[in-house]
Amino acid sequence: MSGEASAPAAKVTFKITLTSDPKLPFKVLSVPEAAPFTSVLRYAAEEFKVPAATSAIITNDGVGINPAQSAGNIFLKHGSELRLIPRDRVGGF
């Protein structure tokens, strides 16, 4: 047996800012490295009371992030400071 099985799961911490609010509120979330980032996106959207299905996560530089990867991968590639954009205000009829 590997010693890793009994060790606590490593966590990563994200500071997620809601860009649609002029006050730029933010939430700090600590999640296991192996957590699917889609779950992090869904939880952050619920915390800000915006629809998760129409929200996106971007970096502070404006680069879109594909949420179909682990939280650990996102952290390593993009860092801890991210932005949540509710896309319900984009486009429309």
UniProtKB/Swiss-Prot annotation:
Residues 92-93 form a propeptide. GO terms for biological process: protein ufmylation; response to endoplasmic reticulum stress; reticulophagy. The lineage of its organism: Eukaryota, Metazoa, Ecdysozoa, Nematoda, Chromadorea. Ubiquitin-like modifier which can be covalently attached via an isopeptide bond to substrate proteins as a monomer or a lysine-linked polymer. The so-called ufmylation requires the ufm-1-activating E1 enzyme uba-5, the ufm-1-conjugating E2 enzyme ufc-1, and probably the ufm-1-ligase E3 enzyme ufl-1. Belongs to the UFM1 family. There is a cross-link at residue 91 (Glycyl lysine isopeptide (Gly-Lys) (interchain with K-? in acceptor proteins)). Interacts with odr-8; leading to deufmylation. One of its GO terms (cellular component) is cytoplasm. There is a cross-link at residue 77 (Glycyl lysine isopeptide (Lys-Gly) (interchain with G-Cter in UFM1)). Gene3D superfamilies: Phosphatidylinositol 3-kinase Catalytic Subunit, Chain A, domain 1 (3.10.20.90). InterPro entries: Ubiquitin-like_domsf (IPR029071), UFM1 (IPR005375). Keywords: Isopeptide bond, Ubl conjugation, Ubl conjugation pathway. The keyword Protease does not apply. This is Ubiquitin-fold modifier 1. Signal peptide: none annotated. The keyword Ubl conjugation applies.
